C-alpha cells in the first residue's frame, strides 16, 4: 500500500507524449523496440487500429485460492472486457453477478467499485495505471529505451529494455532479439515490494499481421489470463471512457444527531480506542465499527446468519497483516443509520465471527455523504452533499485525501524532511504503524528504542485478517507533523513492507481522538477540527 497525496492530472496530449519513431539514434534498445513493434504489427496511435476491444478470462485461479463447491463456482466466474482508443481505456470486470470498472479519460485515471462509487487515482496509483496502460495499449515501443542487460525467460535469451513513460513508473521489457517477441514486462522493477511482473506466454492475431498478447501470467500468485477475443470495434466515442454513475443511493433524513460510542481498551503501552454505532441492516439492528481504513462495508457472521442473503460473488479481504479471509459479496436492500437510509448497497459478508461487532462501516458508507463526527458530544450527523457545504472552523484544516484505494491517505513528515504516506484509519486503535522499510533504511531515527522504561517492546497486531505471524518492533519518535498539527513523542510500530510498501502505514485512533472529524468524500476532503481532548 504505497500511497501518495498529490493528485496528478494527465492532459490527453501529455499522456500521449511518446517519443516519435523517426529520429532515434541507432542503438540496441531502439533496434529491439523497433523489432518488437514489427512483431506486433502496430503500435498505439496506429490509424489502422483506431480502437481495440479485448475479452479476457482466467484460465487458472491464483495459487492459494481457497477451494470451493460446485455451487460456488459461478460466483467466481470472471470476465474482463478491455476497450482501448490510443491510451484511453475502459476495463470492465464481471465477477459472479457484480461488476467493477476502471479507466482513463485522457485526463484522469479512475476506478469504480461494485457499487459504482468512483475514485480518482492519485500520484502513485495513477503512475502505476499509466505504465500498465502504456504496455497494454502497445505504446511502450514508441518510447526511448535504455539497455538493462539480459536474462533467460522460458529457456530463451532476452535483452532487457527499460522505458520510462512521462508521469509513469519505469517499465522493463524482456525482448527476444531473434524475433522481437516480448516475453515479460516488469513495472517498477527497482521496487522490491510494489513491482508488477507479467509473463507473456502467447500472442494471437486480431487482424492480418497484427498481434496482441493473449496469454498472461501475473504476479506472485501465478494467475493466468487468456485473451479469448480481440476485435477492432467501430463507433467508439469519448463517453465510453467516463466513469459510471453510482448504483447505491441515500435517502437523507432530518440531519438529527446519531449516538456513537467510544470504547476504551486498556493495554500495556496505552489505551486503545474505537468508535462504534448502531445501524439497521434490512431492518435488523447491528453494532458497527466506524472504520475509515476499510475499503467497503463488511458484515460478520453474527449478523449475516440472521439476514439470509443470496451471494452475488465469492470474494475475500485482507487487513493489517496481509492475510486473506474468504467472503461473499451480497446486496443489502437498506443500511439505515439514524433516519438516513443507504439503498441497494453491495457489501462483503464474512464467515468470521467477532465477539463485539456485527460489522465494519468503511468507504461505501462514506462515499456519497458528508459524515460529521463530534467526539465531545458523542454523536455523528449524516448530510446530503447536494444541500450542505462543509464549514471549516478556525484552527480546523480541510485535508485533501488520496482515495485511490478507497481509504483516505495523506502525507506525514518526520525529522530530516522524511515523508510517509499512510492511511488515516479510525479503525486502528493504535498510534502510528509504518512500513518497516522506513526503519531498516535509516530514514527514520527514533528518539528512543524503548517505549516504557527499559522495555524493548514488540507488539503483535490483530485485525480483520487475524493475528500477525510475528511481532512488530516499536520505538518512540520525537514528533510527527500532520499538516500544521504536531504529534509529539509518538509511539510507532513497524509492519510488513510487503503490506505497506516503502513508505505506507496507518495513522490510528490515538491521533483522531484529538479532533472532531468531517468526512467529505464527494469533495475529496477530510476536515479535522481540534476538540480540546
Where are these regions (language model features)?
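Short, hydrophobic/aromatic-rich segments at coil-to-beta transitions
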Residues: 48-55, 84-91, 154-162, 180-184, ...
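Bacterial N-terminal signal peptides
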Residues: 11-23
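Bacterial N-terminal signal peptides that target proteins for export
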Residues: 2-14
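Pepsin/retropepsin-fold aspartyl endopeptidases
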Residues: 78-82, 166, 174-178, 182, ...
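N-terminal mature ectodomain segment of secretory-pathway/periplasmic proteins
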Residues: 28-117, 296
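A cross-family detector of function-defining hotspots
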Residues: 60-62, 150, 318
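Beta-turn initiation residues at beta-strand->coil junctions
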Residues: 57-59, 93-96, 111-116, 163-166, ...
